[in-house]
Amino acid sequence: MTLDEYNAFCASLPHTSHVVQWGGAHVWKVGGVAGKVFAIAGWSDEPIPYVTFKCSPASFEMLKSEPGLRPAPYLASRGMLWLQRFNEKSMSNADLQDYLRESHRLASLNLPKALQVKLGLNGLT
């Protein structure tokens, strides 16, 4: 997945916003600019970016040792359940999109309930 493909996919999810920060990383949030981060891409010298996403406890345990995946630097070391795909051979782009969709859903659950209802995200549980 190229950076353009990553950005296009994240933009297709409901109520998302994009910012470039943290050393040129493409950061996607759900719930607007003050919302919750659900995906980060960048930090790679290769044409394919490293993609970091939030996941469930079961997915984290299942995937954290798979080739091409690792607990996300900084985030996972602080107890957060985030993984980073740093090699395209580890997970198909279709699977990555599924995990990005799930990350979006998980992040939306951390928005204030009133905002979830206002944005129509309360049905994502």
Tell what function each PLM region has:
Residues 1-125:
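Charge-dense, helix-prone N-terminal extensions
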